[in-house]
Curated annotation (Swiss-Prot):
Protein name: ATP synthase epsilon chain
Subunit note: F-type ATPases have 2 components, CF(1) - the catalytic core - and CF(0) - the membrane proton channel. CF(1) has five subunits: alpha(3), beta(3), gamma(1), delta(1), epsilon(1). CF(0) has three main subunits: a, b and c.
NCBIfam families named in the record: ATP_synt_epsi, PRK00571.1-4
Primary localisation category: membrane
Species of origin: Xanthomonas euvesicatoria pv. vesicatoria (strain 85-10) (Xanthomonas campestris pv. vesicatoria)
Length: 140
């Protein structure tokens, strides 16, 4: 089966490096599916999930804060601010961040950074969705 190299990296570290048969991410205009021999492309990614199907058929779920996806003939590179593998998510901590962001947005005053609260809420929601997808996959 044909594969393409996939690299997911942040400013701090390499998050994933390996061969993939399919990479799915959410771009600004919708969901993208990148397979081997895909045409070159560069696009911004929305906060959401990235699903990498490895050469052995395993699906790896990542929750990302947004970023840039670049496709070249032999490699897909995803540059992100933050990315977390679904299996590494601390559900209690993420729920706490989500609840705090919701509270700030509901009771906003002059001192609330609305954009930051919205970013935290979006990131927490994405992480919880990735965790839920991982749990569903483990049940099957």
């Amino acid at each position: 089966m044909s594969t393409i190299r996939c690299d997911i990296v942040s400013a701090e570290k390499e998050i994933f490096h390996g061969e993939a048969t399919l990479v799915v991410a959410t771009g600004e205009l919708g969901e993208l599916g990148i397979a081997p021999k895909h045409a070159p492309l560069i696009t911004r990614l929305k906060p959401g999930k990235v699903v990498v199907t490895t050469a052995n058929g395993e699906q790896l779920d990542f929750a990302i804060s947004g970023g840039i996806l670049e496709v070249q003939p032999q490699v897909v590179t995803i540059l992100v601010d933050t990315a977390v593998r679904a299996q590494d998510i601390d559900e209690a901590a993420v729920r706490k961040v989500k609840e705090e962001a919701e509270r700030l947005l509901a009771n906003r005053g002059n001192t609330v950074d609305v954009a930051e609260a919205q970013r935290q809420l979006a990131e927490a929601t994405v992480q919880l969705q990735a965790l839920e997808r991982l749990r569903r996959n483990l049940k099957h």
